[in-house]
Amino acid sequence: MAHLLLHGTLEATILEADHLSNPTRATGAAPGIFRKFVEGFEDSLGLGKGATRLYATIDLGRARVGRTRVVDDEPVNPRWYEVFHIYCAHFAADVVFSVKAAQPIGATLIGRAYLPVRELLSGEAIERRLDILDAGRRRISHGPTIHVRLQFRDVAGDRHGWGRGVSGARYPGVPYTFFSQRPGCRVTLYQDAHVPDAFAPRIPLAGGGYYRQGRCWEDVFDAISNAKHLIYLTGWSVYTEITLIRDGTRQRPGGDATLGELLKRKASEGVRVLLLVWDDRTSVESLGMKWGFMSTHDAETADYFRGTDVRCVLCPRNPDAGRSAIMGAQIAYMITHHQKTVIVDHDMPVPRGGGSRRIVSFVGGLDLCDGRYDTQFHSLFRTLDTAHHSDFHQPNLDGAAVTKGGPREPWHDIHSKIEGPAAWDVLYNFEQRWRKQGGDKDLLLDLKAMADLIIPPSPVMFPDDGEAWSVQLFRSIDGGACFGFPSTPEAAARSGLVSGKNNTIDRSIQDAYIHAIRRAKNFIYIENQYFLGSSFAWKADGIRPEDIEALHLIPREISLKIVNKIEAGERFAVYVVLPMWPEGPPASGSVQAILDWQRRTMEMMYYDIAVALEAKRINADPRDYLTFFCLGNREVKLNGEYEPAGRPLDGTDYAKAQKARRFMIYVHSKMMIVDDEYIIVGSANINQRSMDGGRDSEIAMGAFQPCHLNTKGLVARGQIHGFRMSLWYEHLGMLHDNFLNPESLECVQRVNKMADKYWDLYASDELNDDLPGHLLTYPVRVTKEGTVTELPGAKFFPDTQAPVIGTKGNLPPFLTT
């Protein structure tokens, strides 16, 4: 049967199944009353197999898109009555409903039912009892059925969403989410941990002003220093020995204090200081030192604060109670808490009598730990005797140390500060997590009782203020990490949550990306640490795509958006900035596996584009529509530069990179800008770990300025536009009028040409000057058929023997996707 595209939203309800039999049990086909008696007897005495535990799933092609809770006591006629709101971008012949019996390890298939996709394309609601068939699609005796209700809404028919952008100030935000959109906020956007005075591009904004860059770690230092009641932090890593203020021209009183000293001082002043730090369960103690596979310093941080007024809780990523034993172990040892937030009380923007305070929150990609401090210059060698002498970070090169010299690994990241009602949502996320895993719940301040000191959630800007923001908070998290999730699927659905096999998930970050991509008009600009997913659409090239389970939709949504624009004869461009390779030795098994997934993702997208171009008989380079970049730096040696006492071993990658004086700039950003009017910033990578909801815990915000939209003949020229232009100035070393229209062919070809040139300079055997810009073409070749291969003569990353396009590995995809 032909596979048809379902691109839109599928509203599905699984009501019940009837006349089921279980082939794995001797009583599996006995009358229902007898089966319930036998199974109940076994269950109560702990004998035999106990009660049959049934659940149902929904599949589209090679992707599982829905799963009910487990029903324990109805072996014949289980009733679920569960509703699913499913974003879909899948080719499939049928919607497949499977009924399964849960086991301690795995599950037993009872049977499957099929509804042809072609019946959904009209958009009419369908309610039907479908025959449940065996694995060979044969009828089963007793005639079991499953009762379902379905309605599909194609994106092309969504007149109020598809391609509409942020359609106006009343745009309500992403639907079906736990947190609503909050108007009347203020947002500050940050590129990197610090911006020196020397980085000052003049970027015009609407109204005649110019864009002003924020300074993240300065603002975090000030916020912590000025807090009077509370400081709440979450982090993948929090390292007590870093200093936040390192720019000698912008010192502050107490700026030489370490983060640990600063937090202890505030706690001693009576401020409630609570930390939730991910507990890396690989951490061990050896020879008096504490080590962990991920080098997060979690045990050191906990020891540092032990016995002080700071309460630091090491927080393991516990699985939701509904997980199987195997899945629970995978989550506990392979999955992380990845949220990065700082929440403080802060003075009012306009002083009020009585010393009233408000809540301010920081959200983004920057952990308060070592290796994160950097500026837009991303030096490899020139800060080794100043800002990075005590903070030398280079995990990609074995044996690297400041005593042996650079290159250090530069760090590019994006963060945000939220003021107004949405800042309280970040606080509420912390409180939910603390109540689940923080221990003493009484340590959380009762802010309702402190309303005379800290005002309740309220706007900090009037809606008609030209600089006001509307902000919505999104998460990836489940009931294993978050207190207070509804216990029933019905209540979970009303709260914008997804219920599964006895677990409840918030995966609104993925929903936010999908929603923003679908509404995009002209262009998308992405910076992210990873870019892989939509594995259901990968080619079966040495793998079984259905085994990979990197099912999130973001790459496929992007390629289908581009295809739609090609078919409509309209321009659209997508720019994606990635690290050259994931952090770690580039030839290692984990890095190579991720690069392989990344290449498969790129190839899936470029194949979609190539097919669309061929169908329209357009002779164009696929990179005119979708183009990938990485960041790198290369520096000539200056007089007076830091001279290390030692040197790396000859012939190593370290020695080669030091001699060539080059290295990648590590892209750790997690950001998407759409049409210069909407932005998502957070901790979530574009991979399954971050977008799943049941794997790494994440947090992000989506925001826009109602007075700076592409509406009523105007072009968005607010803070988001200024931020993108500032990022492009950082990466390209210049500004150009073409950059004002990123969707234009002139712009994308100019940027590609500059990045090609910068890559050639980066990869060259000669070095005469510093690189004029950091944006490098990602070193792959894209054919007109959409195939992705290495560049001619560039099989390996410079100074390594690590293949650019990766190699298939043996590590579990659950870990590397």
From Swiss-Prot:
EC number: 3.1.4.4
Keywords, in A-Z order: Calcium, Hydrolase, Lipid degradation, Lipid metabolism, Metal-binding, Repeat
Binding-site residues for Ca(2+), renumbered to this chain: D192, H378, H412, E730
Residue span, PLD phosphodiesterase domain: 333-372, 663-690
Annotated C2 domain residues: 1-130
Cell membrane listed as a keyword: no
Single GO MF descriptor: phospholipase D activity
Cofactor: Ca(2+)
BP terms from Gene Ontology: phosphatidylcholine metabolic process; phospholipid catabolic process
Domain notes per entry: C2 domain is a calcium-binding fold, and the binding promotes the protein association with membranes. A lower affinity toward calcium can be anticipated for PLD alpha due to the absence of two potential calcium ligands.
Name of the protein: Phospholipase D alpha 2
